[in-house]
Amino acid sequence: MRILSVIILSVLFSFSSAQNQGVKIALLKYSGGGDWYANPTSLPNLIKFCNSNLKTNIYSEPSTVELSSPEIFNFPFIHATGHGNIIFSESEAGNLRTYLEGGGFLHVDDNYGLDEYFRREMKKVFPEKELIELPPSHPIFHQKYTFNEGLPKIHEHDGKQPQAFGLFIDDRMVLFYTYECDLGDGWEDVDVHNDPEETRLKALKMGANIIQFVFGQ
Protein backbone atom coordinates (compact mmCIF):
# COMPACT_ATOMS: atom_id res chain seq x y z
CA MET A 1 0.00 0.00 0.00
CA ARG A 2 2.70 2.50 1.01
CA ILE A 3 4.94 1.73 -1.99
CA LEU A 4 1.99 1.99 -4.37
CA SER A 5 0.92 5.28 -2.78
CA VAL A 6 4.42 6.71 -3.16
CA ILE A 7 4.44 5.80 -6.84
CA ILE A 8 1.04 7.43 -7.30
CA LEU A 9 2.20 10.62 -5.58
CA SER A 10 5.35 10.79 -7.68
CA VAL A 11 3.71 10.21 -11.04
CA LEU A 12 0.17 11.54 -11.10
CA PHE A 13 0.06 14.89 -9.35
CA SER A 14 0.79 17.84 -11.60
CA PHE A 15 -0.73 21.23 -12.28
CA SER A 16 -2.51 19.89 -15.36
CA SER A 17 -4.10 17.13 -13.29
CA ALA A 18 -5.18 19.71 -10.73
CA GLN A 19 -6.93 21.55 -13.55
CA ASN A 20 -8.45 18.59 -15.37
CA GLN A 21 -9.26 16.11 -12.62
CA GLY A 22 -10.85 16.45 -9.23
CA VAL A 23 -8.07 16.74 -6.67
CA LYS A 24 -8.43 16.61 -2.89
CA ILE A 25 -6.24 18.48 -0.43
CA ALA A 26 -6.21 18.06 3.33
CA LEU A 27 -5.77 19.71 6.71
CA LEU A 28 -3.38 17.96 9.09
CA LYS A 29 -4.76 16.82 12.44
CA TYR A 30 -1.88 16.38 14.88
CA SER A 31 -1.41 15.44 18.53
CA GLY A 32 0.12 17.50 21.32
CA GLY A 33 -2.70 19.81 22.30
CA GLY A 34 -2.21 22.50 19.67
CA ASP A 35 -5.24 23.82 17.81
CA TRP A 36 -4.77 22.09 14.47
CA TYR A 37 -8.36 23.09 13.71
CA ALA A 38 -7.66 26.85 13.80
CA ASN A 39 -8.88 28.89 10.81
CA PRO A 40 -11.70 26.55 9.75
CA THR A 41 -12.74 28.67 6.76
CA SER A 42 -9.20 29.16 5.43
CA LEU A 43 -8.76 26.19 3.13
CA PRO A 44 -12.29 26.26 1.68
CA ASN A 45 -11.80 29.93 0.77
CA LEU A 46 -8.36 29.30 -0.73
CA ILE A 47 -9.75 26.41 -2.76
CA LYS A 48 -12.57 28.60 -4.07
CA PHE A 49 -10.08 31.33 -5.00
CA CYS A 50 -7.78 28.87 -6.79
CA ASN A 51 -10.59 27.17 -8.67
CA SER A 52 -11.79 30.57 -9.86
CA ASN A 53 -8.45 32.20 -10.66
CA LEU A 54 -6.11 29.31 -11.48
CA LYS A 55 -8.84 27.15 -13.05
CA THR A 56 -7.93 24.29 -10.76
CA ASN A 57 -10.46 21.58 -9.99
CA ILE A 58 -9.90 21.03 -6.28
CA TYR A 59 -12.72 19.56 -4.21
CA SER A 60 -14.46 22.42 -2.42
CA GLU A 61 -14.23 20.87 1.05
CA PRO A 62 -10.78 19.84 2.29
CA SER A 63 -10.35 16.54 4.06
CA THR A 64 -8.83 16.09 7.51
CA VAL A 65 -6.01 13.58 7.83
CA GLU A 66 -3.71 12.26 10.55
CA LEU A 67 -0.08 11.30 9.96
CA SER A 68 -0.75 7.84 11.34
CA SER A 69 -3.20 7.15 8.52
CA PRO A 70 -2.23 5.71 5.11
CA GLU A 71 -4.78 8.18 3.75
CA ILE A 72 -2.08 10.87 3.73
CA PHE A 73 -0.79 9.33 0.51
CA ASN A 74 -4.06 10.25 -1.20
CA PHE A 75 -3.36 13.97 -0.91
CA PRO A 76 -0.73 15.81 -2.96
CA PHE A 77 -0.99 18.83 -0.65
CA ILE A 78 -1.47 18.94 3.12
CA HIS A 79 -1.82 22.13 5.15
CA ALA A 80 -1.04 22.49 8.86
CA THR A 81 -1.57 25.40 11.21
CA GLY A 82 -2.09 26.23 14.88
CA HIS A 83 -0.87 28.24 17.84
CA GLY A 84 0.68 25.63 20.11
CA ASN A 85 2.26 22.26 20.69
CA ILE A 86 2.74 19.54 18.08
CA ILE A 87 3.89 16.01 18.80
CA PHE A 88 4.77 13.42 16.15
CA SER A 89 5.14 9.82 17.24
CA GLU A 90 8.00 7.82 15.74
CA SER A 91 5.66 6.13 13.28
CA GLU A 92 4.01 9.43 12.34
CA ALA A 93 7.41 11.00 11.68
CA GLY A 94 8.33 8.05 9.49
CA ASN A 95 5.05 8.24 7.62
CA LEU A 96 5.52 11.96 6.98
CA ARG A 97 9.04 11.37 5.71
CA THR A 98 7.81 8.69 3.32
CA TYR A 99 5.01 10.98 2.15
CA LEU A 100 7.37 13.87 1.42
CA GLU A 101 10.02 11.68 -0.20
CA GLY A 102 7.33 10.15 -2.40
CA GLY A 103 6.09 13.41 -3.90
CA GLY A 104 3.77 14.87 -1.27
CA PHE A 105 3.92 18.48 -0.10
CA LEU A 106 3.31 20.03 3.32
CA HIS A 107 2.56 23.70 3.93
CA VAL A 108 2.88 24.76 7.56
CA ASP A 109 1.56 28.17 8.55
CA ASP A 110 2.61 29.39 11.99
CA ASN A 111 -0.50 30.94 13.48
CA TYR A 112 1.72 32.51 16.15
CA GLY A 113 3.07 30.13 18.77
CA LEU A 114 3.73 27.07 16.61
CA ASP A 115 7.36 27.69 15.67
CA GLU A 116 9.41 26.03 18.40
CA TYR A 117 7.24 22.91 18.45
CA PHE A 118 7.13 22.53 14.68
CA ARG A 119 10.91 22.86 14.35
CA ARG A 120 11.46 20.32 17.13
CA GLU A 121 9.15 17.75 15.56
CA MET A 122 10.57 18.16 12.06
CA LYS A 123 13.92 17.03 13.46
CA LYS A 124 12.24 13.68 14.09
CA VAL A 125 11.27 13.56 10.43
CA PHE A 126 14.49 14.82 8.84
CA PRO A 127 17.24 14.97 11.49
CA GLU A 128 19.81 15.52 8.76
CA LYS A 129 18.09 18.50 7.13
CA GLU A 130 17.58 22.18 7.95
CA LEU A 131 14.88 24.61 6.97
CA ILE A 132 16.32 27.07 4.46
CA GLU A 133 15.09 30.66 4.33
CA LEU A 134 13.80 31.52 0.87
CA PRO A 135 14.76 34.78 -0.85
CA PRO A 136 12.16 36.96 -2.59
CA SER A 137 13.54 35.70 -5.90
CA HIS A 138 12.33 32.15 -5.23
CA PRO A 139 9.82 30.93 -7.86
CA ILE A 140 7.06 30.43 -5.28
CA PHE A 141 6.78 34.22 -5.09
CA HIS A 142 6.59 34.54 -8.88
CA GLN A 143 3.81 32.27 -10.06
CA LYS A 144 0.55 33.80 -11.33
CA TYR A 145 1.02 36.56 -8.77
CA THR A 146 4.26 38.40 -8.16
CA PHE A 147 5.54 39.21 -4.68
CA ASN A 148 8.79 41.05 -5.29
CA GLU A 149 9.41 41.48 -1.57
CA GLY A 150 8.67 37.87 -0.73
CA LEU A 151 6.13 36.69 1.83
CA PRO A 152 3.46 39.31 2.62
CA LYS A 153 2.68 40.33 6.20
CA ILE A 154 -0.97 39.63 6.99
CA HIS A 155 -1.24 40.12 10.76
CA GLU A 156 1.06 42.03 13.09
CA HIS A 157 2.09 40.51 16.42
CA ASP A 158 5.51 41.69 17.53
CA GLY A 159 6.95 43.76 14.70
CA LYS A 160 9.00 40.96 13.15
CA GLN A 161 9.35 40.53 9.41
CA PRO A 162 7.57 37.60 7.76
CA GLN A 163 9.85 34.76 6.76
CA ALA A 164 9.44 31.84 4.38
CA PHE A 165 11.40 28.62 4.73
CA GLY A 166 11.69 25.54 2.59
CA LEU A 167 12.80 21.99 3.18
CA PHE A 168 14.34 20.31 0.17
CA ILE A 169 14.94 16.79 -1.04
CA ASP A 170 17.56 17.12 -3.75
CA ASP A 171 16.28 20.15 -5.69
CA ARG A 172 12.60 19.65 -4.89
CA MET A 173 10.97 21.69 -2.16
CA VAL A 174 8.73 19.35 -0.18
CA LEU A 175 7.75 21.65 2.68
CA PHE A 176 6.96 25.36 2.75
CA TYR A 177 6.88 27.05 6.15
CA THR A 178 5.38 30.52 6.57
CA TYR A 179 6.43 32.30 9.76
CA GLU A 180 5.47 35.66 11.30
CA CYS A 181 2.93 36.08 8.53
CA ASP A 182 -0.42 34.55 9.56
CA LEU A 183 -1.14 33.73 5.95
CA GLY A 184 -4.05 31.43 6.78
CA ASP A 185 -5.77 34.17 8.79
CA GLY A 186 -6.00 36.13 5.57
CA TRP A 187 -7.82 33.26 3.89
CA GLU A 188 -10.57 33.21 6.52
CA ASP A 189 -14.08 34.56 6.01
CA VAL A 190 -14.15 38.35 5.90
CA ASP A 191 -15.98 38.73 9.20
CA VAL A 192 -13.51 36.59 11.19
CA HIS A 193 -10.68 39.13 11.36
CA ASN A 194 -12.20 42.10 9.52
CA ASP A 195 -9.06 42.45 7.42
CA PRO A 196 -9.04 45.09 4.68
CA GLU A 197 -9.87 43.59 1.30
CA GLU A 198 -6.38 44.44 0.03
CA THR A 199 -4.78 42.43 2.85
CA ARG A 200 -7.09 39.47 2.38
CA LEU A 201 -6.47 39.48 -1.37
CA LYS A 202 -2.69 39.45 -0.80
CA ALA A 203 -3.06 36.40 1.39
CA LEU A 204 -5.23 34.56 -1.13
CA LYS A 205 -2.90 35.39 -4.00
CA MET A 206 0.09 34.11 -2.06
CA GLY A 207 -1.87 30.97 -1.23
CA ALA A 208 -2.69 30.52 -4.91
CA ASN A 209 1.01 30.82 -5.72
CA ILE A 210 1.72 28.01 -3.27
CA ILE A 211 -0.87 25.76 -4.92
CA GLN A 212 0.39 26.57 -8.42
CA PHE A 213 4.00 25.97 -7.38
CA VAL A 214 3.18 22.65 -5.73
CA PHE A 215 1.32 21.23 -8.70
CA GLY A 216 3.83 22.67 -11.17
CA GLN A 217 6.97 21.11 -9.67
Regions found by a protein language model. Give the residues of each.
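An acidic, glycine-rich "communication" segment
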Residues: Q21-K24, K29-G33, T41-N45, D115-D191, ...
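Short alpha-beta junction capping motif
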Residues: I25, F77-E116
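Aromatic-Pro/Gly-enriched surface loop or interdomain linker
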Residues: A18-F77, T81-G84, D182-L183, W187-Q217
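Alpha-helical scaffolding within the catalytic cores
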Residues: S60-L67, G84, S89-G94, G159-Q163
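Surface-exposed patches in mature extracellular/periplasmic domains of secreted proteins
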Residues: N57-V65, V108-N111, K129-S137
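Bacterial N-terminal signal peptides
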Residues: S5-S14
